[in-house]
């Protein structure tokens, strides 16, 4: 859970039909009392009128037309306060989908996008994320946090329930709230149905949604260049597949059938779900962070097969520090790096680094307390912030830590330490070149080492920055005038940087010597990229 000012929201307890569950609380500013409901109490109905949505805000999945609370009377309304850089917010999406399926048109879910980062305030960027994650309910751009403040939200995600009479029932923060919300929503629908006050008819915005772009690549998240073997691996994330091409763009193979799923097999039958980071263990073995499958996949480039080595598709908060890899349930792995016989994993969902040993087939906690933060120190004491990019110079592991807009340096082996090269806090971000603590990045998702320098995908600034790890000096290398749109990853080969230019649905190629940026044209004579 993302916490504003570091203050966690303490949930009260409530009794519902004799079952003790984590409870809702009243929104700050509406009422100071916790919501406590016992089995013998007749009603869950709220008492405080829900604050109206301000006029003239941008709406998504409504054709641009605003939604009013008045027209939602007769429905249970669930407000989901989120920000699109927050991984915990995306963990809530499957719960929202389950709730919508349970209650159909009796429940209306409204996404209230209240941005943390400056770039997240842009409606066009929110639209891209709505597409990437398949969000089909209405979303309002609460860019100045007016709705957030009116409802007293304090952390991302926060979920607020409004009853069919238009009154606030309560709210709860953090992921993992499905059981509570399901009980409360179900009870409200039962209560108001008995009073003849439920409107089960679909509303006017039902079925309105954005159209997905028809492009060869769809929101590619990461890229891996292999200069020695003239290969380029592309995580074609929203097509749920890996594309293998030459460095000049000739498509050699497509790995995965393009449908979301967790299935092993040959290239044509294997399935991925929103794959991200990749790394080569050797010329014949590619590892993939299969992010939405909460799995690590191994691709045999000779046999042309895909095998799951860790994860079973379920996401949990990992409390054990070591376990057999195949039986492990992971938490949103976003990047991988193979070094000296060990696979390092950026476990973004719980702000830690893990490791996989192919010889023992075990997975172990490597670094991070699990607390979201930017604390340096020993491997066990250090904290990370949604780590999403990994690289190495052979001596150190370098980590792109986006929620702290930071770059971290991590030693290898027992007794190693974690040091911050760039970044000062979870809410310290911007676009400032300079040295050390004066530098400001904005939600950097990618990093690669090349020719003595660290190149950073400064994602929300839509730039590529270069960092000298010894002096901590950062300078802008490319971008800033529309060349990129939220690049998620990058990799180098020879004189070129290859950039996953995510929102432009392309791979960009940057000449390191001249700085010239061009689109990598994919040559696909066998039509391997065609979607089924």
Each language-model region and where it sits:
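Thiol-based oxidoreductase modules, predominantly thioredoxin-like and allied folds used
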Residues: 106-121, 135-145
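Short, internal strand/loop/helix patches
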Residues: 127-162
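Thiol-/selenol-based redox modules, centered on thioredoxin-like
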Residues: 163-222
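Gly/Pro-rich loop segments of beta-rich domains
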Residues: 199-221, 249-276, 305-334, 362-386, ...
């Amino acid at each position: 859970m993302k916490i504003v000012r570091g203050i966690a929201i303490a949930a009260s307890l409530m009794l519902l039909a004799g079952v003790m569950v984590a409870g809702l609380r009243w929104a700050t500013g509406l009422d100071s009392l916790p919501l406590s409901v016992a089995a013998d109490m007749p009603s869950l109905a709220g008492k405080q009128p829900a604050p109206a949505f301000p006029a003239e805000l941008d709406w998504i999945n409504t054709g641009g037309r605003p939604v009013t609370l008045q027209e939602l009377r007769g429905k249970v309304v669930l407000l989901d306060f989120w920000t699109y850089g927050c991984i915990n917010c995306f963990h809530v999406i499957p719960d929202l989908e389950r709730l919508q399926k349970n209650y159909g048109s009796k429940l209306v879910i409204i996404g209230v996008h209240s941005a943390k980062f400056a770039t997240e305030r842009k409606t066009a960027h929110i639209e891209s994320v709505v597409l990437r994650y398949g969000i089909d309910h209405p979303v309002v751009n609460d860019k100045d946090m007016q709705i957030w403040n009116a409802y007293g939200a304090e952390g991302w995600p926060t979920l607020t329930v409004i009853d069919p009479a238009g009154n606030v029932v309560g709210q709860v923060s953090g992921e993992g709230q499905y059981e509570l919300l399901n009980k409360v929503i179900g009870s409200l629908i039962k209560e108001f149905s008995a009073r003849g006050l439920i409107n089960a008819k679909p509303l006017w915005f039902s079925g309105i949604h954005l159209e997905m772009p028809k492009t060869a690549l769809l929101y590619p998240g990461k890229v891996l260049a292999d200069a020695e073997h003239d290969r380029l691996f592309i995580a074609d994330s929203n097509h749920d597949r890996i594309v293998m091409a030459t460095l000049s763009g000739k498509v050699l193979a497509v790995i995965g059938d393009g449908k979301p799923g967790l299935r092993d097999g040959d290239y044509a039958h294997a399935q991925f779900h929103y794959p991200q980071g990749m790394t080569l263990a050797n010329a014949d073995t590619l590892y993939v962070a299969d992010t939405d499958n909460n799995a690590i996949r191994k691709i045999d480039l000779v046999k042309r097969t895909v095998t799951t080595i860790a994860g079973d598709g379920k996401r949990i908060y990992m409390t054990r520090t070591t376990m057999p890899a195949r039986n492990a349930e992971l938490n949103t792995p976003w990047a991988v790096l193979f070094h000296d016989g060990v696979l390092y994993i950026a476990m973004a969902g719980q702000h830690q680094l893990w490791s996989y040993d192919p010889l023992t087939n075990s997975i172990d906690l490597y670094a991070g307390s699990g607390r979201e933060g930017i604390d340096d120190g020993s491997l066990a004491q250090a904290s990370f912030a949604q780590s999403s990019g990994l690289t190495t110079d052979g001596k150190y592991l370098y980590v792109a830590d986006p929620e702290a807009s930071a770059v971290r340096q991590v030693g290898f082996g027992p007794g190693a330490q974690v040091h911050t090269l760039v970044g000062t806090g979870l809410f310290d971000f911007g676009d400032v070149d300079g040295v050390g603590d004066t530098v400001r990045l904005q939600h950097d998702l990618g990093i690669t080492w090349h020719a003595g320098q660290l190149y950073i995908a400064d994602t929300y600034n839509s730039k590529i920055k270069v960092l000298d790890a010894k002096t901590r000096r950062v300078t802008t290398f490319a971008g800033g005038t529309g060349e990129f749109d939220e690049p998620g990853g990058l990799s180098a080969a020879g004189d070129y940087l290859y950039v996953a230019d995510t929102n432009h649905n392309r791979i960009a190629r940057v000449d390191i010597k001249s700085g010239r940026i061009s689109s990598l044209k994919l040559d696909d004579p066998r039509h391997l990229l065609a979607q089924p």
